[in-house]
UniProtKB/Swiss-Prot annotation:
This is Hemoglobin subunit alpha-A. It comes from Drymarchon melanurus erebennus (Texas indigo snake). Red blood cells. GO terms for molecular function: haptoglobin binding; heme binding; iron ion binding; organic acid binding; oxygen binding; oxygen carrier activity; peroxidase activity. Heme b binds at H87. Heterotetramer of two alpha chains and two beta chains.
Length: 141
């Protein structure tokens, strides 16, 4: 459960991310595909080279979807409902990939922070991204 302090920290940390969605998204996906090559399975039709237009476009979609969750921290499930259905029922993405994506996104945020993230910010981001992952797998049966 996100506290009001968590929500405040997430919103503050997310500002630069949402303003640079394509950059953060593409970099996060590059980290994901590099660290966890099995995640490439769902993107066989993409050019997965760093900086490709496919990574930029899909990365922006990912960040925009998470931004919607940030903008609705009191109803993350509602904000991500359609996306959860899509990934569970149509795309059938392995649920563990959402957790891996969250970790890669945290690293990307930290890399662009200009210095170490404060422990309480890391904790709040981690709680939020775990909530996002949990929400996205909620439609799996």
């Amino acid at each position: 459960v996100l506290t009001e302090e968590d929500k405040s920290r997430v919103r503050a940390a997310w500002g630069p991310v949402s303003k640079n969605a394509e950059l953060y998204g593409a970099e996060t996906l590059t980290r994901l595909f590099t660290a966890y090559p099995a995640t490439k399975t769902y993107f066989h039709h993409f050019d997965l080279s760093p900086g490709s237009s496919n990574l930029k476009t899909h990365g922006k979609k990912v960040i925009d979807a998470i931004t919607e969750a940030v903008n609705n921290l009191d109803d993350v499930a509602g904000a991500l409902s359609k996306l959860s259905d899509l990934h569970a029922q149509k795309l059938r993405v392995d649920p563990v990939n959402f957790k891996l994506l969250g970790h890669c996104l945290e690293v990307t945020i930290a890399a662009h922070n200009g210095g170490p993230l404060k422990p309480e910010v890391i904790l709040s981001l981690d709680k939020f991204l775990c909530l996002v992952a949990k929400t996205l797998v909620s439609r799996y049966r």
